Amino acid sequence: MPTIQQLIRNARQPIENRKKSPALRGCPQRRGTITPKKPNSALRKVARVRLTSGFEITAYIPGIDHNLQEHSVVLVRGGRVKDLPGVRYHIVRGTLDAAEVKDRQQGRSKYGVKKPK
């Protein structure tokens, strides 16, 4: 326990909570432009995205197959990918240049698919 004199000399510092998605700067989503990431793996689809806030982040492309190329404009939301270290963002499908997932029947809202007629 510190003495009162020690507390007067230097007060207790409040603990700062660190954000899990700092590049979004407190916004729910942000827009960005894609640059392809190095391995362009067939196993996991990720993209380097330059945000309007100036950050360069790695974002995961959910769902089967995608139409994204270099200079595509995408919307990015928070949410990490467990087995990919350093990937803390998801690209929102069905908005801007990211097309919805084809022939999706269940969990459609997560992949930007409209209700089938």
Swiss-Prot record:
PROSITE patterns: RIBOSOMAL_S12 (PS00055). GO terms for biological process: translation. InterPro entries: NA-bd_OB-fold (IPR012340), Ribosomal_uS12 (IPR006032), Ribosomal_uS12_bac (IPR005679). It is found in: Plastid, Chloroplast. Residues 9-40 are annotated as: Disordered. Its main location: plastid. One of its GO terms (molecular function) is rRNA binding. It comes from the Eukaryota. Part of the 30S ribosomal subunit. With S4 and S5 plays an important role in translational accuracy. Located at the interface of the 30S and 50S subunits. This is Small ribosomal subunit protein uS12c. The lineage of its organism: Eukaryota, Viridiplantae, Streptophyta, Embryophyta, Tracheophyta. The gene is rps12.
